[in-house]
Swiss-Prot record:
The gene is miaA. It is an enzyme of class 2 (transferase). The record marks 93, 115 as: Interaction with substrate tRNA. This is tRNA dimethylallyltransferase. ATP binds at residues 2-9. It comes from Shewanella sp. (strain MR-4).
Amino acid sequence: MGPTASGKTALALELAEKHNCEIISVDSALIYRGMDIGSAKPSAEELARGPHRLIDIRDPAESYSAADFRADALREIEQIISMGKTPVLVGGTMMYFKALLEGLSPLPSADEAIRADIQAEADANGWEALHEQLREIDPVSAERIHPNDPQRLSRAIEVYRISGKSLTELTQTKSAPLPYDVVQFAIAPRERKVLHELIGQRFRIMLEQGFIDEVAQLKARGDLHLDLPSMRCVGYRQCWQYLDGEFDYDTMVEKAVAATRQLAKRQLTWLRSWPELNWLESGAEGNLVTLMRQCR
């Protein structure tokens, strides 16, 4: 695991090529078909070297939860182990890693009709009014969720309307943790400025590869919008807004790079508090040797 642009894929491919391993992607952007450039999806050449499971498994119009990931990942892990191989989970979606390792609370699946009702109420009365509703049914979640966070606010109210129980009540029970021995590694540059430079370089390469055309094709479908989880992925939102004429090209680049750096900061914050983690430095010689030594 590690922040975006830290070299996770390169190390995973080296591991898969030289040892009896198969890769499982742990990335909330790579699951979507047609979102290849902006998600830094492994190239056809890289996938030939080391096939990745759990990429291209959803259309961008579809939702995909941490619970969906856990179920899919457990199935893939079992299959890889049954083949006599070692699963290697690689990615930067820390919520997915946490769900897999620790288990999840038994929350109800999304209900599109209820979500539409909640959105209609928000359009009519504002999210502040819905936040007051949440405060009445689940004061603990209301303290934690800001009125300006419509995604989490909507989900908390949706859970109550489906189940009759508050999010706080339901999250007190979790499914069983991962039933396997796990060795955990994080890879990142030692200096933040190096990571920032890598992020800027990678976004410029994405633009050269045709990222704007990729977003334009997604936009032209007509069934996608910026409230979807897929279109909230860093880079895609900013490019979509640029195509809408909200700002110029240079501002789009600046905003996309800044959003990606903020994502990396959040990822590193998660990792610094992560227990039992072995750290590797991006680009350092001998990372594979160090990794294999720790796994023995």
